[in-house]
Amino acid sequence: MADEDLIFRLEGVDGGGSSGAGRHGDSDTDSDDDEGYFICPITDDHMSNQNVNSKGQGYYNNLLKTECGSTGSPASSFHFKEAWKHAIEKAKHMPDPWAEFHLEDIATEHATRHRYNAVTGEWLKDEVLIKMASQPFGRGAMRECFRTKKLSNFLHAQHWKGASNYVAKRYLEPVDRSVYFEDVQLQMEAKLWGEEYNRHKPPKQVDIMQMCIIELKDRQGQPLFHLEHYIEGKYIKYNSNSGFVRDDNIRLTPQAFSHFTFERSGHQLIVVDIQGVGDLYTDPQIHTEKGTDFGDGNLGVRGMALFFYSHACNRICQSMGLAPFDLSPREQDAVNQSTKLLQSAKTILRGTEEKCGSPRIRTLSGSRPPLLLRLSENSGDENMSDVTFDSLPSSPSSATPHSQKLDHLHWPVFGDLDNMGPRDHDRMDNHRDSENSGDSGYPSEKRSDLDDPEPREHGHSNGNRRPESDEDSLGSSGRVCVETWNLLNPSRLHLPRPSAVALEVQRLNALDLGRKIGKSVLGKVHLAMVRYHEGGRFCEKDEEWDQESAIFHLEHAADLGELEAIVGLGLMYSQLPHHILADVSLEETEENKTKGFDYLLKAAEAGDRQSMILVARAFDTGLNLSPDRCQDWSEALHWYNTALETTDCDEGGEYDGIQDEPQYALLAREAEMLLTGGFGLDKNPQRSGDLYTQAAEAAMEAMKGRLANQYYEKAEEAWAQMEE
């Protein structure tokens, strides 16, 4: 068979072969037996099955030598070619699982196929021939599935018995046509992250099934269907978009993959709802920071919080340098129950796993794919760039109390990275095309009903007719793909970020205040944990919700610059009314008073007007002032002035106007302080009279005529003292 007759290139694979090809019903356990060859069971010679483990290990070692040494020899290339050709011959002679349904006898339909390129963000159109069963063979909460055969565009004759089996899915209830396109975008974006995960050489590689849209032009209304390959095997749901993990399906790889996507994307997204056959996944869900992409299943930071509440870091997470998410002691005890179950998983680490963000990995991080360009920029800084890690310290400094326990993760100190300029990156090796795509045929599960976001509209563009190759999400040519990726906004590079608060705090400490408050997605995740605890999501109906854990996450959110958390803790520790965790009251101690005032002062510096007034009054009257401070009218005057000038958005992006404290009242208090002097403030009758006049004018605007007259009189009295 000539090379050009293949629908994929014959070349060496980086750290593993095609994931998911040939997965079967036994794939619900992490067995290491199917990894003796990187080209999995379909290529195993029946004469060498007894030596598969030893030969597989030798093959793996030779592959490592090839990667680290020369670019490869003709002998090694020949080995790959023969293995792939052998696999193709075996695949050709496999029986058709749908032969009994005689789909070849169904009428042929013309369809327009829409495929999405996740790298360029473009939609491509071509024409295909299909045969679809009239009755569904499976039905879920939202969609139903139809057996389908699609004829390859490479064929010159219509040989339907040899056509590939597909699953066509459509929604049970009518939905906007844009929903179909949005679903494909989601799955192809998730496929990109699966490929990024595989570049870090995990023990088991993953793959997301290829999915496209077919438009049946000859039917009334030209209905749309999702189209995926059919894959035999046992379909398992490993986690959901609401953080649920089945105890009898505990596995390491799916959970580690979700955790990896959160850190590798710089906290901008997480891929969850992992389900499929073995490590060939379908119908995933992506949670993004704002939650405005990818339909109603995108729960935003709340979905991220739900995942980490139930996630127990496993040995794959540790081998890839993924930092554990901070949980309270009580939450950690609950997660430890899952940790015990993880001991039964059979995945064996090879010891060659790359750390997340390792300089040895030539990833596609030279620029952002369209999804990351669409996401909120809050998690990144304008001058931030993706730099290689070999010039950085291998462990964080001890600036925070939890730094020492994170040294083994080899995360760099982020404080010096946010203001660095772009650096040259090594070009990535040509990315191989993938023909591994399919589906278990299982209908999609219903998305979570936790949210009801505003509807989104996503259009699509038409492209030229493309060859039949079911290319992976990076396109049909690895070389073209990498060149295209590198052309996309090379100045906007993203850096992996750990899930640990201590390391995120180090990064934020290097930023100025305006770029620190409200800029951490990790802080928003911890704040979402607070809301879930307060709402009773993490407890049974007849149980009290965990107040200690809620305060734990509220403090972590405040440490990460979440203004709402900072204000809430300031009010809570100061024994003042607070809207977040309103039922929680803390003991009134000097230590808590100091904490409360420090939080309020931090919130005031961040632009929260209510906190400015509280701090000013504390310095003015001495009430609610921390024990280590004393009355200071000059400080009070400063914060009164700042509050008066604050009429726009604070650093958290929220608008806080002057309705809570009338402007004329603050001006009158300033005038009174300057008229009498004291507590470090010198008398200034002239300025006092001016402020009384401004207060009178503000009172007149507020329809307070009698009060305005009083202020005018006091202004005259102040100016009289100046003349004396």
Curated annotation (Swiss-Prot):
Residues 385-403 have a biased composition (Polar residues). The modification Phosphoserine is found at residues 18, 27, 70, 73, 77, 242, 358, 365, 391, 397, 434, 444, 469, 473, 476, 499. SUPFAM superfamilies: HCP-like, Protein kinase-like (PK-like). The N-terminus is blocked. Its EC number is 2.7.11.20. It catalyses: [translation elongation factor 2] + ATP = [translation elongation factor 2]-phosphate + ADP + H(+). Gene3D superfamilies: MHCK/EF2 kinase, Phosphorylase Kinase, domain 1, Tetratricopeptide repeat domain. This is Eukaryotic elongation factor 2 kinase.
